[in-house]
């Protein structure tokens, strides 16, 4: 059974017309984007963004927010830290398509072992990680060095 949230704190709503070659916007108008299919997916590689880019930004922002909160609670200096999120899409052996994600932390003011621990804890706190756990491959790393996790 999926985990259930106990209280809805915020709801985002978006409308897309035209799928991957269309246009998307949020109900509050803060995001209003054209969508294009990358050439690697036999698209026209137009000037618009795509769902994978939007997912990468959303996941990285959410994950880093979780990490920053944990770092503050442990009195670690996360100033200047960055999360790089890489999202890949491809065919599944069983049919359809799937995603894979890699999250890499660059934290110049945090010791390597502390940074690894932050990545593991953020992975447990981040809503994107909780939503995708067990469904897609997520690779965690610090400065390109893998962080083993379940």
Functional labels for PLM-detected ranges:
Residues 1-57, 64-150:
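Extended beta-strand/beta-hairpin segments
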């Amino acid at each position: 059974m999926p985990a259930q949230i106990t209280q809805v704190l915020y709801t985002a709503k978006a409308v897309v017309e035209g799928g991957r070659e269309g246009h998307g916007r949020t109900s509050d108008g803060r995001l209003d984007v054209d969508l294009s299919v990358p050439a690697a997916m036999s698209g026209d590689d137009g000037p618009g963004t795509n769902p994978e880019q939007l997912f990468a930004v959303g996941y990285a922002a959410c994950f880093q927010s979780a990490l920053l909160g944990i770092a503050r609670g442990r009195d670690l200096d996360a100033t200047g830290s960055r999360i790089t999120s890489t999202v890949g899409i491809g065919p599944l052996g069983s049919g359809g398509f799937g995603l894979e994600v890699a999250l890499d932390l660059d934290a110049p003011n945090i010791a390597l072992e502390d940074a690894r621990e932050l990545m593991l804890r953020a992975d447990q706190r981040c809503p994107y990680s909780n939503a995708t756990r067990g469904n897609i491959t997520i690779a965690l790393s610090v400065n390109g060095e893998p962080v083993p996790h379940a």
